[in-house]
UniProtKB/Swiss-Prot annotation:
Classification via InterPro entries: UBQ-conjugat_E2_core (IPR000608), UBQ-conjugating_AS (IPR023313), UBQ-conjugating_enzyme/RWD (IPR016135)
GO CC entries: cytoplasm; cytosol; fungal-type vacuole membrane; nucleus; ubiquitin conjugating enzyme complex
SMART domains: UBCc
Quaternary structure and partners: Heterodimer with MMS2.
Single GO term (MF): ATP binding
PANTHER family assigned to the protein according to its UniProt record, in alphabetical order: UBIQUITIN-CONJUGATING ENZYME E2 (PTHR24068)
Protein name: Ubiquitin-conjugating enzyme E2 13
Organism (species): Saccharomyces cerevisiae (strain ATCC 204508 / S288c) (Baker's yeast)
Positions annotated as active site in the UniProt record: 87 (glycyl thioester intermediate)
Pfam families (UniProt xref): UQ_con
Effect of residue 110 to R: Lowers rate of ubiquitin chain elongation. No effect on thioester formation at the active site
Length: 153
């Protein structure tokens, strides 16, 4: 960890020692800027029965540049496209060096709880969500069962 900036070391230590409920973020053994992340689907959301895998990468310019995050688990969500890219303001225009990895992960977890079809990345999913929200939520639940890891009982 010696070649990493102190900020990354501190954030990593805090993520491991004081994890966010429902979220794990483990640095990769070979590259400590790369994290394997899991996020549990929030209660009372179409994703509540699943655990989703993501990858998070801290660019060389971090914290001046936002982390790069994407879903590895296929998910039916208006703000996440087929490639796993996420439409989230804190990853784009609202990024600030004052924000941390845990803030980003909490924001992604909140996005699962409250999809926003009015600011979509997956236009087809957003259209479904707007036309028939209950049907879209049912499809999101179905995809969660098909593609996400099941939460332990």
């Amino acid at each position: 960890m010696a070649s990493l900036p102190k900020r990354i070391i501190k954030e990593t230590e805090k993520l491991v020692s004081d994890p966010v409920p429902g979220i794990t973020a483990e640095p990769h053994d070979d590259n400590l800027r790369y994290f394997q992340v899991t996020i549990e689907g929030p209660e009372q959301s179409p994703y509540e029965d699943g655990i989703f895998e993501l990858e998070l990468y801290l660019p060389d310019d971090y914290p001046m540049e936002a982390p790069k995050v994407r879903f590895l688990t296929k998910i039916y969500h208006p703000n996440i496209d087929r490639l796993g890219r996420i439409c989230l303001d804190v990853l784009k225009t609202n990024w600030s060096p004052a924000l941390q990895i845990r803030t980003v992960l909490l924001s992604i977890q909140a996005l699962l709880a409250s999809p926003n079809p009015n600011d979509p990345l997956a236009n087809d999913v957003a259209e479904d969500w707007i036309k028939n929200e209950q049907g879209a939520k049912a499809k999101a639940r179905e995809w969660t069962k098909l593609y996400a890891k099941k939460k332990p009982e």
